[in-house]
Design a protein with these regions (language model features):
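A late C-terminal transmembrane helix in Major Facilitator Superfamily
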Residues: 332-369
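Central cavity-lining transmembrane alpha-helices of secondary-active solute carriers
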Residues: 57-71, 259-271
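Helix-loop-helix hairpin linking two adjacent transmembrane segments in secondary transporters
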Residues: 144-192
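Cytoplasmic helix-loop-helix junction between adjacent transmembrane helices
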Residues: 109-148
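Interfacial helix-cap and linker-helix signal at transmembrane-aqueous boundaries
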Residues: 41-42, 73-74, 159-168, 243-244, ...
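Extracytoplasmic gate region of multi-pass secondary transporters
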Residues: 34-35, 216-259, 266
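Extracytoplasmic
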Residues: 15-49, 121, 125, 235-240, ...
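Conserved MFS/SLC helix-loop-helix module at the cytosolic interface between two early adjacent transmembrane helices
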Residues: 65-104
Length: 398
């Protein structure tokens, strides 16, 4: 018996899509603003760089564990229940930032918000499969969803900068996110979601999710996504440090390099739907991964004068890789397994986002310059390209 979903009208379908878009934008506002927040907490709590970096890797680890250990609940409890529970926890956690004044209190809230994100994100990713009638539509929707994530990544740091310039604390970003999240929760509660039918014999448990870690398709896509995430996070965590000593004629470009990277990434994801309608997704992944590798390689060969141009430009080529691989990885499985496989992929995503920058930092400290961390990232970009070349030539999913 095949998995199906009950039909809902076009208006409800559009409402579900926009709710999903806004959810991804909302949590990107907080997760991708951490780079602007860390200097503030270093000053406020007299922290070392290692201690302050916990604001980045601790919630990422929480997202990873939540996705892996709780992702199957999106299949067991249903998408709507999972999404609403996650949004409620995230909203309450966000409001609690307003009453806190200690580093450990804030870090505890980051753990809670990470768990909530992992919970409702797996539900939202599984929901995309429910509302998609084909693999191409799934990939198109996923690119649009990640486009809104890219918009949130631009809005979040801008809000923090505005709050600080206006004399307000960074923590009120979370209050703003909490208000938006509470509104989304109410709208999600009032929205009719497609009801999924599954085989009566299916046993939806954590054991099934852990077993999926051995599936070659889940493992293959997750590994490729992890490699991509390491190369992407390298940009928004360490590129400002790499370009800090730039003394050329394009000082303004070095100053706004990270913003330009985020803009390219967001625009590319919105364009992804059109590009993927014209070309085979495996060809697109091969070409974009090659372009990313070249951006890294030539930045390392020709130094900071080339990196100031090439690393921000890489955002355009990175834009389509994550949503496309995520979509193809999830849609390989039955709809009743989408929550579990989304949790597995999210686990690899968040672990890579947490450990990648740490590995780069360790290598940079060992050799005394941040460029050595980028040599490591270049290696990961090269491996990603080789995987996409193998995918194009051997077509293992067909």
């Amino acid at each position: 018996m095949k998995n199906t979903t009950t039909s809902i009208d076009h208006q409800q379908m559009q409402r579900i899509k926009w709710l999903t878009y806004m959810m991804f934008m909302m949590f990107a506002m907080t997760t991708d603003a951490v780079g602007v927040i860390i200097p503030e907490i270093i000053t406020a709590f007299d922290l070392s760089l290692t201690a302050a970096s916990a604001f980045h890797y601790v919630p990422m680890i929480a997202i990873a564990l939540s996705g892996l250990l709780l992702g199957y609940l999106a299949d067991k409890l249903g998408r709507k229940t999972t999404i609403i529970l996650g949004l409620v926890v995230f909203s309450v956690t966000s409001f609690l930032f307003a009453v806190g004044n200690s580093f450990w209190f804030f870090l505890s809230l980051m753990v809670c918000s990470g768990c909530a994100i992992g919970f409702f994100k797996t539900g939202a990713l599984a929901l995309i499969g429910d509302i998609s009638s084909s693999g191409n539509e799934h990939t198109t929707t996923m690119n649009t969803v990640e486009g809104f994530f890219g918009v949130g990544a631009i809005i979040g740091p801008a809000i923090v900068s505005y709050l600080l310039a206006s004399g307000f604390a960074w923590k009120y970003l979370y209050v703003i996110a909490g208000i938006l999240c509470a509104s989304l929760c109410l709208l999600a509660w009032k929205t009719n979601y497609p009801a999924m039918k599954k085989e009566q014999s299916e046993d939806i448990t954590l054991k099934r999710t852990l077993k999926m870690m051995k599936n070659r398709y889940a493992l293959g896509f997750s590994s490729a996504i992890a490699l991509y995430v390491i190369t992407e996070v390298a940009i928004y965590v360490w590129m400002p440090t790499l370009l800090r000593d730039y003394q050329g004629d394009m000082i303004w470009l070095a100053t706004y390099a990270l913003t330009i990277f985020f803009v390219f990434r967001a625009l590319g994801r919105f364009l992804g739907a059109w590009v993927l309608s014209k070309f085979n997704w495996m060809q697109v992944m091969f070409a974009t991964s090659l372009a990313i590798f070249c951006c890294y390689l030539f930045s390392m060969i020709y130094g900071i004068d080339a990196a100031v141009y090439l690393l921000p430009l890489s955002g355009l080529f990175m834009s389509m890789i994550y949503p496309t691989l995520n979509s193809k990885g999830i849609s390989c499985f039955k709809k009743s397994e989408h929550g579990a496989v989304a949790g597995v992929i999210l686990f690899f995503t968040a672990v890579a986002a947490a450990l990648g920058p740490l590995a780069m930092g360790a290598v940079s400290d060992l050799f005394g310059d941040v460029k050595y961390g980028f040599y490591l990232a270049t290696g990961f970009a090269g491996i990603l390209f080789l995987m996409m070349a193998y995918n194009l030539l051997q077509k293992p999913t067909q």
